[in-house]
């Protein structure tokens, strides 16, 4: 399945929640005020959804939020089910530990898509080495930094300003003056987005 390159707000409207695909300069309700309904000819008609439909929508919502393709998401679920612990929580931890997401959470990218681009352009270092694979799983103690040659990029400076408003997660130590941060540990479920109902995803894959 190809990566979606259309209007980002359209995806958020489809899921009925802010997927954090835009920078956050404007609140979600302001950005979508003109198109408050779900996209499509019958967007306003949100009838009662079946159990399967709710499960599928939740999976699509999370997949789009983290910018992960269908096959990648399926592989993450298999890994989450294989290791010890609650499968749904394990899945979210794997997604949150992706390098592109960590770069975003640390405030070096204004969106996950921008953070992914920074990684692919080799503007990010992991433990002192330049990397270009957005899906790398960051481990506790890993140090992520902006490469010296990219430190003057205006988009990174803008992202840091936005991060100051958004806040930095407790499971990271970030020094924006040095443009580097340390991933202290994988987050607890209480630290993760409350609007995600991972149990629906587990139910979907358990069929």
UniProtKB/Swiss-Prot annotation:
Signal peptide: none annotated. Coiled coil: none annotated. The keyword Signal does not apply. GO terms for biological process: ribosomal small subunit biogenesis; translation. SMART domains: Ribosomal_S4, S4. Gene3D superfamilies: Ribosomal Protein S4 Delta 41, Chain A, domain 1 (1.10.1050.10), RNA-binding S4 domain (3.10.290.10). One of its GO terms (molecular function) is structural constituent of ribosome. It comes from the Bacteria. Residues 26-53 are annotated as: Disordered. Keywords: Ribonucleoprotein, Ribosomal protein, RNA-binding, rRNA-binding. Residues 97-159 form the S4 RNA-binding domain. Pfam families: Ribosomal_S4, S4. GO terms for cellular component: small ribosomal subunit. NCBIfam families: PRK05327.1 (NF003717), rpsD_bact (TIGR01017). Part of the 30S ribosomal subunit. Contacts protein S5. The interaction surface between S4 and S5 is involved in control of translational fidelity. Belongs to the universal ribosomal protein uS4 family. One of the primary rRNA binding proteins, it binds directly to 16S rRNA where it nucleates assembly of the body of the 30S subunit. This is Small ribosomal subunit protein uS4.
